[in-house]
Structures are given as structure tokens and as C-alpha cells.
Amino acid sequence: MNTLKTIAASAGLYCAGAVFGLSSALAAIPIQHWTQPSGAQVYLVESPSIPMLDVELDFDAGSRRDPAKQAGLADATALMAGLGVAAKGGQPALDENQLGQAWADLGASFGASAGADRMSFRLRTLTEPDLLAKSVALASRQLGDPSFPEAVWRRERERLSAALREADTRPGTIAGRAFSQAVYGNHPYGYDTTPASLQHIGVADMRARYRDFILPCRAKVSLVGAVNRAQADQLVAQLLARLPQGASCAPLPPVPEVAPLTAAKEERIPFDAAQAQVLVGQPGYKRTDPDFFALLVGNHILGGGGFTSRLMHQVREQRGLTYGVGSSFSPGLHAGAFTVGLQTRPDQADAALGLTRQIVADFVAKGPTEAELKAAKDNLIGGFPLRLDSNGKLLDNVANIAWNGLPLDYLEHWTEKVQAVTADDVRKAFARVLQPERMVTVVLGGKPAAPAK
């Protein structure tokens, strides 16, 4: 078995990712798409240069589907899916240690995670025939027959609860939770996993989540690697074979949209710390927003471009009020938050906050300068190949296309879309999406500056 590990390591399996190739990243990336008889949607990029395969299986089972009293159910389900496989079809059960050893012996990996919108399962394996067959077979068992052992969940629940209690002592966690609740209100995007909510989650709830959501007909499967279409089709069918076949795939219940803010909100949280945490923002936009590229470029200029951004230039370099400040959007199936965040000395919090608000309001009203626009587009376009320079990164992009229903040639036209953005496009998009007069503000640890003597 050590030989298998050596082969895997030599092929870069334990590295950051298999290199797809810079020249390939700059060229057209053909994405093949088809639907299996089960209803599974399959997206494939053939990358034959390295004998490796990366697969992502996505299901509409993220935390937006969690009941309010069971916040954390999606995360718990994804965690426990990797901690045991049930005995079935004459094959013995595997506990977490046996499962981990089996993957180590194959020099491969398989795991699950949950985000706000989706639950994802990822397989990485070499494509040497024997290794590939064994990896797919084991992944199929883990995906289709998780055991959700009660004793393991009790242990993990205690571990997670302790970690949450410790996190609740950190200023960043406290400020972030207050900000999220103020921005999202009662929307599931704003639910907080707490020790109390974990106590309401049992293995029966995880099994029910699996039964209702993790079905072949709900799967969006993305593959990047050294397999052709026929091989990919067979592999996907094998991966999904142990899930319920022919199950009803009635539309899932709709999740309400994030409610827009109707008035400004400000929360001051006392906290004894060397640095005050300042967060400003509101609900932003959905991933399918037609102004996605204008908002992408605009945020790069405002605060997403690091030291070249307007916020960094004015708040840090000109005024010295912080070591770092930035802005971001987090679009999903619903409007994710627009967030501006910084840390500063407590006696400078009000000055930093006032300047940040002024910069955001000015940007929303007037948009960027032509010089800022050119610099941002050059930076984004110049860095585009780095978004695709490994199989893992390419898989991220293909899965994004699959999940959001984007055009199959999305990556081929990405730089063109960025280049086509005008300053007026940015101004109009920001004016439509953001309302500076109705934003949430959270200041943790700040205090007014002492009066001059």
C-alpha cells in the first residue's frame, strides 16, 4: 500500500492541485454537459495531461435549508457523512478510522462540506485503472451509505459546542454575528449555529436531510481530469448508484428572498480590546444578477483590490486609520451581504467609520474614475489565468457554472465581459444595488476620541 501512496505523491495528489496548464487556461475550455437518465446533470472538462481526476457533486442541501431551531444541520450532516459507512450488500461497515485508512491506502480523498446554498462532495483520485475503480467504489459507499453513528455524533457535538463557545470570546466572531443578524434578519443566511441549536440536531435529522435532498435527480456533478465523456458518464452513474434510484424529485420548497433594509441600523458593542472591529454593509445581489461584471469590477476598485483600492488608499495610506480595509460581495442563490470591514484603534473608530461611509456613498453616487477603471480591469484580466491554473481551481469554476446555470462558454468570455464594463455601468449598478443611507453598522470595542485638552 505504501507503493500507492508513493505513486499518488509523485503525481502531485498531495500538492495544491494538478496543473491544468497556463497555456490551456488562456485557450478555450470546452465544457461538455449532459443529463443522465437519473436526472443528474453532468459537466466535464477533459484534462488528459496528468493522470488525475477531480469530481464535485453538489446538492441543494446547504444551510439555507436548515430549520431555525436546528441551525448547523447542514454542516453536521456533511461532517458526519465522512465518519462512518454502513454495512450493506455483503460489505462490512467502516468506522471513521477504517474509512480514513482506506482513503490513505488509495492515495485519494473524498469529503463533504456545506455552504449557505449547497452541500458538496469532492473526490480526488489518480486515474490509473485499478486505483480509479477502487476510489469510485469507496466514494459510492460513503456517499450512498453513511452510517451517522450516534456515539460519534455525541462526541462531535460536544467538540463543536466547545469550539463555538471559544469562538464566542473572539471580537471578530462577535462582530460578525451581530452584523449577519442585522443584515439578514430572519433569513436562513443569517442563522447562527450555537451549542443550543446543535442540541436540537440528532442523527435522525441527518438521515432525513439525506433522504430528502441527496438524490441522483438533484445532483449537479462537475468533473475535471483525465477521463473522456463515456468514462465520466459511467463514473457518475457509479458514484450515485447507492442513492435512492427513481425517487420523486418534486420541486423543493422555495426559500424566501433576503428582505431589503428599510432604515439604517447601528449597533455598538462594548469590548475591551486593542483594536475596534468596524463592519458596514447591507444585502447585496444574487449571483444571477445581470450586472455581475459591473459589480465585480466596481468592488475591485472600491475595496476588493487590496492596496490599489480606493478604501485602502484613503483610509490607510492617506489617513493612517487602519492597517487594512476592504469590501466584498457574497452573492448566492439569494442576495448575499455587501460588507466593508476594518480594524482600528478604539479612539479612531468613529473617524474611520465616518470616512468609510463617505467613501462608499461617494462611490455609489459618482462611480469610478477612468484611471481606476482601467487599473482594475487590467488587474482582473491579468490575474485571470491564475484562477484556472490547477485542476482544483478549474473544478471550482466548472462547479460554479453548473450550480448557477451559467453559459458553458462563461470562462471563454470572462475577460471580454470584464473589458466591456464602463464607468457608467459601475455607477448605475452600484446605485441600484447599494443604499448607503440604509446600511447596517456594527462597531465592537470602539469609543469616542478623548476631547482635546
Question: Language model features by range: what are they?
Answer:
Residues 29-31, 56-123, 191-192, 306-321:
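M16/MPP (pitrilysin/insulinase) zinc-metallopeptidase core fold and M16-derived inactive scaffolds
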Residues 56-58, 248-308:
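His/Glu-based metal-binding/catalytic segments typifying zinc-dependent metallopeptidases
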